[in-house]
């Protein structure tokens, strides 16, 4: 699928490719070497001499309509008389090429060199790294051009900064061909000019290539503008560069990193959006910003080699930004507050809230506090909208007095600048509407209460007023007037008990006032906002409890009077009672199966007695009773009987 889009322009070398694996900093990666065997170089180079070549620093965007799914993509190379460091590698993998390398994204101006997601050189494998060249993508300028300033000399094993060595005829022909295209020159002259760049002395080529390198960058830029090529190529070319300043001749194989990524092509069939996980404050996101930075740095094209020489020995380009250039770029972007445009089209089915993400997250780093505050205002306004709906709650006392200030606060919050201003304003309107609804319910409810009070008969307990605002608990508990205590039941419009477990428990009620129910007003002062019918039930229950206490006290007084009227029996009369010996267990003594005083059955060997009224008891039980009261415990007959 789409393999024809990534076929090499030139046939594969007959010598084949060599592959090896290496270990970098604890992580294992596969490195592919594209250098054919030494014996096959001349034969491969001779096959390439007659082919007309496309400039190696540029790739055609219209050529890639489909992408290869292989993580190790096919490449386009040109092998000539010797190893050419100007050859390019196109990474066409969709999964590995959507994201630009970190250093590539961080380069705001045209850099001499960049690298893409490769490991740091460790101390233990510095020789291994310095032995072979590293394949790296050239930095893309803000006009979409890729610049190379690092050349690798396979014969010397070192990077050439001044110019191409005598064996770099392919690279020299590319520069000459590009300059000849700007001027209408026959093809024969182009071929003849290439022959001029065949093997020369190393000193002469190095002294003359310094201007050619700058000319290559300028000519490629002019050719870009003349042909109106898009600023986003479909493939990111990768140039072969040296791995160290002083490399040995033993290991010269160029290494290709499979994890190098390039920007997504505008010709993709299904564009996808991606969110940068790295710190991308230095990455220019719009084409205009790329072009502006390129124009600012137009005079620095000759500084590519200088930046290349300023690199570390391991071959890493250090990000060097002039302070004035960074400040100018920050001043250019920050006042605009324009959301950054991604280089790929957004898929509407992939991220639903991508606009909000761009709105709050894609601005500069100094705007983080603004969108956090906006989200907080939106969240608070949503809470106020939910809490201010007075139609679904029972109207509570004092709420109508405190609702207008809350509505004003919500409205003032809504007028504050920010994305959540409209939501806050809507919340304030909802709060005011809730307060108006509460006032309307109160006005409708008050006349009905007055009519019911007027129709009460004498002796009935009136419904307690709960609209009075002079109670002490209302002034102390501001949050308790709008939220009910779970223990104190909440009633709806029909006075039906409802259990709402989500209400707050901040309500503090002085439950000691429940002890003062003599007049039924203590609870009304403590919880005056509770439904009056509920308080009526509580008052009735308290009245019944008081009546029971009065009845019990009366019965006790009657018992005392009886005891006073019946004095205890004399000791002689108690001893004169007859004794009856129980002969069998659980046997009936007289008509009784058990003693009425201790309620226990008669057991064999116990002593029972009979009173003159013919009631039987245990003699010890009835003796104690008669010492307190001279009556029968069952029938209250006098003992001893009167004469």
From Swiss-Prot:
Keywords: Metal-binding, Phosphoprotein, Transferase, Ubl conjugation, Ubl conjugation pathway, Zinc, Zinc-finger. GO terms for biological process: protein catabolic process; protein ubiquitination. Residues 95-105, 145-158, 173-183, 213-227, 289-310, 320-362 have a biased composition (Basic and acidic residues). It catalyses: S-ubiquitinyl-[E2 ubiquitin-conjugating enzyme]-L-cysteine + [acceptor protein]-L-lysine = [E2 ubiquitin-conjugating enzyme]-L-cysteine + N(6)-ubiquitinyl-[acceptor protein]-L-lysine. Substrate for E2-dependent ubiquitination. One of its GO terms (cellular component) is cytoplasm. It is an enzyme of class 2 (transferase). GO terms for molecular function: ubiquitin protein ligase activity; zinc ion binding. Its EC number is 2.3.2.27. Residues 1-363, 380-454 are annotated as: Disordered. This is E3 ubiquitin-protein ligase Praja-1. It comes from Homo sapiens (Human). The lineage of its organism: Eukaryota, Metazoa, Chordata, Craniata, Vertebrata. The gene is PJA1.
